[in-house]
């Protein structure tokens, strides 16, 4: 472990703030090894602000590689219990009042274990969003806030086409049920809007890969060809595309998907209100347009 920690030593001594990630492999670096890792990394607080724990992603391309066992519902629950125990201990010692919980389980653990996501306060300001920690909680809270905003509701009621709208919302299997809950809120408020959540099976990387960010254009085309013709728009999260490009990981573009499915594609999911705007067919806010398109035009 001393070899692995020489970089944090140098960065801490240089006054650099750090956020870390641990990719957990079942039977290899979990259990007592995870305890040791968290203990070692927590000694770098407050320079080390947070550490995310994420499960290893197992694609179908594993010929010649060491065998790895995927986590299941029970083992994911054990990982959560272990991390939450560390959160309580670290928050109690008062070393870093800004990010007291320090170590965070990615959303995937909670969904795999069938558990409720932590409350917002435990994410310490969402320091690990890019590693999939708190994305679902943040999206849900932002959608709820927009649905409780009189100004947004007034704008939406004036903008939404009361003659009817049908959209397909494509996502990975991991977040399917959470998106169905959110879109259920939307359709209850605007019953003339129909939102069909379609979880895309990952044939490109393998069915064990369930995150939205690794869905390819080819998988979208093959699995939505039957339904796209009767929808007004296809919504996809910006995470499906390469950073700063309208290109999927299989080199197909959003234009390719539009052409094959004969349906407009809208890129969204930069926040709860923007998610609502996309579902309802409203114009994106200027800030959302900047975030999604700033390096595309």
Each predicted region: which residue ranges?
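Short, hinge-like loop/turn segments at secondary-structure boundaries
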Residues: 37-38, 69-71, 283-286
């Amino acid at each position: 472990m001393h070899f692995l920690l020489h970089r944090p030593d140098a960065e801490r001594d240089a006054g650099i703030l750090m956020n870390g990630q641990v990719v957990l492999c079942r039977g290899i670096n979990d259990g007592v090894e995870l305890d040791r890792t968290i203990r070692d990394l927590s000694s770098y607080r407050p320079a080390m602000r947070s550490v995310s724990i994420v499960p290893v992603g197992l694609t179908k391309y594993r010929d010649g590689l060491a065998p790895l066992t995927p986590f299941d519902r029970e083992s994911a629950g054990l990982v959560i219990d272990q991390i939450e125990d560390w959160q309580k201990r670290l928050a109690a010692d008062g070393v870093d009042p800004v990010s007291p919980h320090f170590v965070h389980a990615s959303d995937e653990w909670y969904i795999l274990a069938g558990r409720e996501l932590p409350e917002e306060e435990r994410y310490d300001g969402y320091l690990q969003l890019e590693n999939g920690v708190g994305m679902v909680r943040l999206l849900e809270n932002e959608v709820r806030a927009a649905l409780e905003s009189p100004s947004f509701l007034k704008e939406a009621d004036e903008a939404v086409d009361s003659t009817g709208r049908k959209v397909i919302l494509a996502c990975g299997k991991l977040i399917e049920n959470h998106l169905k809950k959110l879109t259920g809120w939307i359709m209850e408020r605007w019953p003339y809007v129909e939102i069909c959540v379609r979880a895309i099976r990952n044939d490109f990387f393998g069915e064990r890969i369930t995150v939205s960010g690794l869905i390819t254009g080819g998988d979208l085309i093959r699995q939505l060809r039957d339904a796209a013709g009767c929808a007004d728009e296809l919504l996809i999260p910006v995470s499906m595309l390469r950073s700063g490009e309208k290109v999927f990981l299989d080199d197909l573009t959003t234009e390719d998907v539009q052409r094959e499915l004969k349906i407009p594609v809208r890129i969204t999911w930069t926040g709860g209100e923007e998610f609502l705007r996309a579902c309802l067919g409203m114009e994106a806010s200027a800030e959302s347009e900047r975030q999604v398109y700033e390096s595309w035009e």
